[in-house]
A protein has these predicted regions:
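Catalytic micro-motifs at enzyme active sites that drive phosphoryl/nucleotidyl and oxygen chemistry
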Residues: 75-79, 112-117, 200-222
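Mobile, glycine-rich extracellular loop/lid and propeptide segments
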Residues: 193, 213-215, 221, 241-245, ...
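Long, low-complexity, charged/polar intrinsically disordered accessory regions
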Residues: 1-89, 95-98, 280-453
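A short, contiguous, amphipathic alpha-helix enriched in charged residues
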Residues: 177-209
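Long, contiguous juxta-domain segments that are non-catalytic but functionally important
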Residues: 74-124, 129, 134-145
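Helical (often loop-to-helix) elements that flank the catalytic cores of nucleotide-handling enzymes
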Residues: 231-273
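A solvent-exposed, charged loop/short amphipathic helix patch at secondary-structure junctions
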Residues: 139-175
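Histidine-centered divalent-metal-coordination microenvironment in nucleic-acid enzymes
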Residues: 90, 127, 205-239, 309
């Protein structure tokens, strides 16, 4: 019985492929799926797209030179990548997101993608900001033994779980996650003030001499608390295009970061007679990006930092804490889920707090699966480097150029004299078993850019 259940999906895939082959659709479907880059959860669209040339002298609309109808495509629909960054939801799209994040971070460290190469000479640091403690948890200290008396192996599921769940402050842990993005926003304000203070400048004068640029990602620790990894850079007043002032240094930047992290705070609610104020934890790590120790004796290089940050860009709470990668509809769903008891308590706490009127703006029930955190996992300042949107557009332009290279030049109207009429409607999501198998066969390989960091 077990064998039949295991082979059932493969049998359905083979039947789908056989049907497509008998209709003569298989070669065309392969070409259509290749454009998804291995995405197994694409958006399906119904509709059409028509191109008409325009006479630039009379403005007259000519007959259609191209027409694309979704129903004429091998899959019966136009298929669009889901672009989900979560590796647990779509490994192929998450891998593309990781590579794009790697390129984005790298461009801000050594130039490229429209960012000047001189940024490599600007003061740059790699900083990690953590959450405060909500109670003792199982860990692997330098002494080798946890406070519970056990020497835990690196892969034990107990790591990050409370020594005493009944006294662990789950409410504070969830509320800190919910306010983490606000703390970061306050930190960036204080950082500019602290840098200006050390340079002997006022806030207004600082803007005329220098600019702080950064890129950061959020990561969950095993205890379920969010912390931030960030590349922070000191530029001239116009960003990476201008050299930083003579007083700018990695040492000054490091000192300013530590000072700003100590005072940055976000006001919280009043619960059970307790007024909350949230700040970063005391464990703050700031390292200049140059020939310095990073981890295990390796150098803190541009490539290592970019790979380290990109690695976490595709992970959510489900990867580290064993929780969910989708929102809950009902709290009763928890009873059926195979998740850790610690994650279950964090989710339940967020759900219960979400019912309180004074916490309505935090939308804790909508973000219970994220343990309260509702911020963006990857953010950056405008002048740090290129954008993910620009990288996606460059990739789309390249694919379009490749597809049009086989079309005779005189058969296509110039882009600026063509009217495009398009109408698309949502038709569903996902692939059939056969389509899924073919798409997975064209997924991008992992373990390339910076994957070893």
């Amino acid at each position: 019985m077990t064998t039949t259940t295991t082979q059932a999906p493969e049998a359905r895939a083979l039947r789908d492929l056989a049907d497509l082959a008998s209709l003569g659709h298989l070669p065309g479907l392969v070409r259509q799926l290749q454009g998804l880059g291995g995405c197994t959860n694409p958006i399906r669209l119904d509709g059409h797209r028509t191109e008409h040339p325009i006479d630039t002298t009379t403005g007259e609309l000519g007959p259609a030179v191209r027409h694309l109808a979704a129903s004429d495509l091998p899959a019966g629909h136009l298929l669009v990548r889901c672009n989900n960054r979560r590796a647990t939801r779509c490994a192929a799209c998450a891998e593309t997101y990781r590579r794009d994040t790697y390129q984005l971070i790298t461009a801000g460290l050594k130039g490229g993608k429209g960012t000047p190469e001189q940024v490599a000479t600007h003061p740059r640091v790699f900083a990690t900001f953590t959450a405060p403690s909500s109670g003792p948890v199982h860990n692997r200290p330098a002494s080798g033994r946890c406070r519970c008396g056990t020497q835990h192996p690196a892969d034990t599921p107990e790591l990050g779980t409370p020594l005493d769940p009944d006294t662990y402050d789950y409410e504070t842990a969830v509320l800190w996650n919910a306010h983490a993005s606000k703390i970061w926003a306050r930190f960036t304000i204080y950082l500019r003030r602290e840098v200006a203070k050390r340079a002997g400048l006022t806030q207004r004068e600082f803007a005329e001499h220098a600019r702080v640029s950064f890129a950061k990602v959020a990561e969950y620790q095993r205890r379920g608390a969010v912390h931030f990894h960030a590349v922070i850079r000191l530029d001239g007043p116009d960003g990476g295009d201008t050299p930083p002032p003579h007083w700018a240094s990695a040492e000054l930047l490091t000192d300013a970061i530590r000072a700003a992290a100590r005072v940055a705070s976000a006001p919280g609610p009043v619960l059970h007679g307790r007024a909350y104020t949230f700040m970063f934890g005391t464990q703050l790590d700031v390292r200049p990006i140059r020939s310095a120790d990073f981890a295990g004796g390796t150098e803190l290089t541009d490539r290592a930092v970019a790979a380290y940050i990109a690695k976490y860009a595709t992970k959510g709470a489900e990867t580290t804490t064993g929780t969910l990668d989708r929102p809950l509809k009902f709290l009763a769903e928890l009873a059926q889920l195979r998740i850790s008891e610690h994650a279950r308590r964090m989710i339940r706490t967020a759900w219960i707090l979400g019912a309180r009127p004074e916490l309505e703006d935090l939308r804790l029930r909508a973000w219970a699966h994220m343990l309260g955190f509702r911020g963006h996992f990857s953010t950056k300042t405008r002048r740090y480097s290129t954008t993910l949107g620009a990288l996606r557009q460059a990739r789309a332009d390249w694919r379009r150029a490749q597809s049009e290279s086989t079309v005779p030049a005189d058969s296509t109207a110039a882009e600026d004299t063509t009217l495009v009429l398009a109408h698309w409607t949502y038709a569903g999501v996902g692939l059939s078993r056969g389509e899924e198998w073919l798409s997975a066969a064209h997924a991008p390989a992992t373990g390339l850019e910076g994957a070893t960091a």
